[in-house]
């Protein structure tokens, strides 16, 4: 189930867009060989925001924020313990949350009939990435998952296009 609400505004040289998406996901797992089952539900709000400014008829500046979600799959959520190796057991975590990746970017663009330039700077980060971790309890290696991952990324890009035809 999903719903989206958005708003767009333009005033002279300034433009903007804002949006928010709501997503509800329900997972239900039944095992054929066992009398076991579990379910998981996710409710996520996913915002986006963009501002633009027309510097000149052929030049613009844009800044934006976006969020992306990655929901955990059944394997990550499955609470039942795999004991096929009694010295190293594994199980999922039904309390996992959706992983949320945030992205901020600024872009300058200039274009003409002969030459196009785009310069972008992007910063993205995740504070609750789904990661596997292990620990020893009572002499047994336990492996499971949690929202403990963190990452940051900075990206600079330059795009040049030259039209060589007369």
What are these regions, as identified by a protein language model?
Residues 11-14, 54-58, 101, 111-115, ...:
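Outer-membrane beta-barrel channels and translocator barrels
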């Amino acid at each position: 189930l999903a719903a989206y609400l958005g708003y767009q505004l333009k005033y002279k040289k300034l433009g903007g867009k804002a949006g928010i998406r709501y997503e509800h996901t329900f997972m239900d797992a039944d095992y054929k060989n066992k009398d076991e089952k579990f379910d998981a539900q996710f409710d996520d709000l996913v915002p986006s925001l963009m501002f633009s400014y027309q510097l000149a008829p052929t030049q613009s500046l844009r800044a934006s924020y976006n969020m992306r979600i990655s929901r955990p799959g059944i394997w990550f959520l499955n609470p039942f313990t795999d004991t096929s190796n009694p010295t190293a057991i594994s199980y999922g975590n039904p309390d996992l949350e959706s992983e949320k990746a945030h992205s901020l970017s600024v872009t300058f663009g200039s274009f003409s009939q002969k030459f196009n330039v785009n310069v972008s700077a992007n910063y993205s980060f995740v504070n609750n990435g789904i990661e596997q971790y292990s620990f020893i309890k009572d002499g047994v290696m336990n492996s499971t998952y949690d929202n403990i991952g963190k990452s940051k990324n900075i990206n600079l890009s330059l795009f040049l296009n030259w039209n060589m035809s007369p």
